[in-house]
């Protein structure tokens, strides 16, 4: 580590400017930490992020790294904290997300409403089928990577249940067809061969692959979300029901850090959070730059980012730990509990370490 000089006082050195490296990964979700990294705020804070390689990729689900921070979907951290390794992480912040998502059909499909899905072939991951059918089998005995992939089928499962409700249908009214689903079906060899766990490396050409599945005629509809949904729609596919218009389909993007850092290096954690908050505020006036850096991280077009995350997502990047944000996380936790994907609830208020975010926000009041 090296100390840097405070530009306002050349004769001094700042503890907050000590250079540190943290292992890092992010899911394909909007987040202030990625923004802080790509826009220079972390560099100014003396922090570098070392993105997980594909060969290190299991850490993205196990959190088994002493100096690790992750910004992504809420299901993996809930499983780690509630099922496998309680106390390994602390919750630093939440970014609510409600973007484009739904079950898509070909443009020439006769399906125009949810009720038209009756008797149709719905393509979902094998993980989602296990959840929807209540057939978890050996779920609790699986290794962390495969276990988490099963639980990630929750995204499709919840979306299908909500879609079918619009047509007053149930799961038994459609035919579930197993297909490979991006973000859920990630074989170990695919992970290990990926340069990093960035979306651009791990999930290339998602929309093209999904469009090909629809074109094959093997299924009548399949699920897509996030910027991938925007790119799939650009191929001519259309959602049967735009679930992005329904608040029940909002998710909590969760930011965690190794608990050991909170205990042993609170100053480092504070610098990290300060940089993310500053970047989140900066993003409000730099929407084009923020959109571009997210697009590059995921390997998608800037237009797809706006569709997948919401046109004004740049205004909402500052992490939160307020009641509504925690309630959003609790809603996902309840789905996991109801479907036996989680055995005991995580006490979210105890998991959270709000002092860092509170300190950062107070700097701007």
From Swiss-Prot:
GO terms for cellular component: cytoplasm. Keywords: Cytoplasm, Hydrolase, Monooxygenase, Oxidoreductase, Plasmid. Induction: Expressed during growth on DBT or DMSO as sole sulfur source; this protein accumulates to lower levels than DszA or DszC (at protein level). Part of the probable dszA-dszB-dszC operon. Desulfurization is repressed by sulfate, cysteine and methionine. The keyword Ion transport does not apply. GO terms for biological process: dibenzothiophene catabolic process. Coiled coil: none annotated. It catalyses: 2'-hydroxybiphenyl-2-sulfinate + H2O = biphenyl-2-ol + sulfite + H(+). Can be used to remove sulfur from polycyclic aromatic sulfur compounds found in gasoline and diesel (biodesulfurization), which are a considerable source of pollution. In addition it may be possible to engineer the operon to make specialty chemicals. This is 2'-hydroxybiphenyl-2-sulfinate desulfinase. The gene is dszB. Pathway: Sulfur metabolism; dibenzothiophene degradation. It is found in: Cytoplasm. The record marks 60 as: May orient the sulfinate group. Belongs to the DszB desulfinase family. Transmembrane segments: none annotated. Its EC number is 3.13.1.3. 2'-hydroxybiphenyl-2-sulfinate binds at residues 27, 60, 70. Monomer. Disruption phenotype: Blocks the desulfurization of DBT to 2-HBP, accumulates an unknown intermediate that is not DBTO2.
């Amino acid at each position: 580590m090296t100390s840097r000089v405070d530009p306002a006082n050349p004769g001094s050195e700042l503890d907050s400017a000590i250079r540190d490296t943290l292992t890092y990964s992010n899911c394909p979700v909007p987040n202030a930490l990625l923004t802080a990294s790509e826009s220079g705020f972390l560099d100014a804070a003396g922090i570098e992020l070392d993105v997980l390689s594909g060969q290190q990729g299991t850490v993205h689900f196990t959190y088994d790294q002493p100096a690790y921070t992750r910004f992504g979907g809420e299901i993996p951290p809930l499983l780690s904290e509630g099922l496998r390794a309680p106390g390994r992480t602390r919750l630093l912040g939440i970014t609510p997300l409600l973007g484009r998502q739904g079950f898509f059909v070909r443009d020439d499909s006769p399906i125009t409403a949810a009720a038209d899905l009756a008797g149709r072939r719905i393509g979902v991951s094998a993980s989602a089928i296990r959840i929807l059918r209540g057939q978890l089998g050996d779920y609790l005995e699986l290794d962390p990577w495969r276990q988490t992939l099963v639980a990630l089928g929750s995204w499709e499962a919840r979306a299908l249940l909500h879609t079918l409700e619009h047509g007053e249908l149930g799961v038994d009214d459609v035919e579930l067809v197993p297909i490979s689903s991006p973000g859920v079906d990630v074989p170990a060899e695919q992970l290990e061969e990926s340069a990093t766990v960035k979306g651009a490396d791990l999930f290339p050409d998602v929309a093209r692959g999904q469009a090909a599945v629809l074109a094959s005629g093997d299924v009548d509809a399949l699920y897509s979300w996030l910027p991938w949904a925007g790119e799939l729609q650009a191929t001519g596919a259309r959602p049967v029901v735009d679930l992005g218009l329904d608040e029940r389909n909002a998710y909590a993007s969760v930011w965690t850090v190794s608990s050991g850092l909170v205990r042993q290096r609170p100053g480092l954690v504070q610098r990290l959070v300060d940089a993310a908050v500053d970047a989140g505020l900066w993003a409000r006036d730099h929407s084009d730059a923020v959109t571009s850096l997210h697009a590059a991280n995921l390997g998608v077009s800037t237009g797809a980012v706006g569709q997948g995350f919401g046109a004004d997502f740049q205004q909402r990047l500052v992490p939160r730990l307020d009641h509504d944000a925690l309630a959003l996380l609790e809603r996902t936790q309840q789905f996991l509990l109801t479907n036996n994907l989680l055995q005991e609830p995580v006490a979210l208020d105890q998991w959270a370490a709000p002092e860092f975010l509170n300190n950062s926000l107070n700097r701007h009041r």
